[in-house]
Curated annotation (Swiss-Prot):
Part of the 30S ribosomal subunit. Contacts proteins S9 and S11. The gene is rpsG. PROSITE patterns: RIBOSOMAL_S7. One of its GO terms (cellular component) is small ribosomal subunit. NCBIfam families: rpsG_bact. This is Small ribosomal subunit protein uS7. GO terms for molecular function: rRNA binding; structural constituent of ribosome; tRNA binding. GO terms for biological process: translation. InterPro entries: Ribosomal_uS7, Ribosomal_uS7_bac/org-type, Ribosomal_uS7_CS, Ribosomal_uS7_dom, Ribosomal_uS7_dom_sf. Belongs to the universal ribosomal protein uS7 family. One of the primary rRNA binding proteins, it binds directly to 16S rRNA where it nucleates assembly of the head domain of the 30S subunit. Is located at the subunit interface close to the decoding center, probably blocks exit of the E-site tRNA. Keywords: Ribonucleoprotein, Ribosomal protein, RNA-binding, rRNA-binding, tRNA-binding.
């Protein structure tokens, strides 16, 4: 196995409309089959709807929605002497953002509204108001970590 050290992370360029790296990461994650234009259209229309419904600046509302979904702790499986324990560990800040984006998109796609714009804006609005599938997922993750606090000494 070659020993070249860690692979350097590629910087994501900020998106053209809001000049936000978070928005660019969200669009890239939402993209299917390389169709970035379609993903951008859906994202920007969703932010317009979000701005109408919240009355706040679109990008600020989006950032607040992502912040409300970020998990601070998660559990990782750790095998100790034949038993597997769910060990709570803190989540790195870049992983917090990645998980929040992933959960928002997953739960937006699973919603019942017609069209992805309606689904995404609905999920972002719910996340903005601290409810919805993605926020529930974060709460479940925190609950799992809290329940397995006794195994925290197995951290590595």
């Amino acid at each position: 196995m070659p020993r070249k050290g860690p692979i350097p992370r590629r910087e994501v360029l900020p998106d053209p409309v809001y000049n936000s790296r978070l928005a660019a990461r969200f669009v890239n994650r939402m993209m299917v089959d390389g169709k970035k234009g379609a993903a951008e259209k859906i994202f920007y229309k969703s932010l317009e709807v979000l701005q109408e419904k919240t009355g706040e600046d679109a990008i600020k509302a989006f950032e607040k929605a992502v912040d409300n979904v970020k998990p601070f702790v998660e559990v990782k499986s750790r095998r100790v002497g034949g038993a597997t324990y769910q060990v709570p560990v803190e989540v790195r800040s870049d992983r917090q953002v990645s998980l929040a984006i992933r959960w928002l998109i997953t739960y937006a796609r699973a919603r019942g509204e017609k069209g992805m714009v309606g689904r995404l804006s609905g999920e972002l609005l719910d996340a903005f108001n601290n409810r919805g599938g993605a926020v529930k997922k974060k709460d479940d993750t925190h609950r799992m970590a809290e329940a397995n606090k006794a195994f925290a000494h197995f951290r590595w």
